[in-house]
Amino acid sequence: WGGAMGAEIFSSAGVSAQVIGAPAAPTSAQDTQLAVKALDATHIDLLLFVGGDGTARDVLAAVDEFTYTCVLGLPAGVKMHSGVFAISPTAAADVVAGLAQGSLVGRILREVRDYVPAVPGASISKHQTVATKRYGELWVPEAAGYLQQMKVGGKEDEDLVVQEVVSYFLDNPEIYSGKALV
């Protein structure tokens, strides 16, 4: 993708790259989603993105769930609760090198989660319990030791737990097909 979303990095490193689109300035969530859709349509093997949970949500919103696109996040946000991030940029580079050499072939679904503010629009204070919400799952390379584990906040919010259980059953109807849920 053009500009600050990839092309500038390749250019500064002296690496040629095919640029299939360009972001607005400054970049936005919409630019991320447009880039993901365009790249996904080319049937890429791996989509690397840089950011935090908000960017992971943008990727999730744009990736075609039926293409099984494999993604890997490079942690660059202020909070990463999702399980789709490498533990470091070096770990991400090792995963990419392994994929290029054919040594890593498995993939696994990992959750995309994000902070849920107690008050809409509020930021996290150091005295506040952090609650997160599950937004879905993305395919990531199965690379034990290279991926961050999903982080879970301390205190459960019963309404969020109920919402997540209901969402899980709605997303996986084969689990209860032909059975009564009480």
Name every feature range the model reports, one short phrase each.
Residues 46, 69-70, 180:
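Proline-centered loop/turn at the N-terminus of a beta-strand
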Residues 9-11, 54-69:
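Short Gly/Thr/Asp-enriched flexible loops that form oxyanion-binding sites at enzyme active sites
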Residues 50, 63-88:
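Short, acidic/small-residue loops that bind anionic groups at enzyme active sites
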Residues 1-44, 93-175:
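ATP/NTP phosphate-donor binding region
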Residues 67, 174-177:
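Short helix-terminating capping/connector loops at secondary-structure junctions
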Residues 2-7, 49-57, 78-79, 180-182:
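Gly/Ser/Thr-rich loops at beta-strand to alpha-helix junctions
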Residues 35-38, 44-61:
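A glycine-rich beta-strand to alpha-helix segment
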Residues 57, 90-94:
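Residues on a specific face of well-ordered alpha-helices
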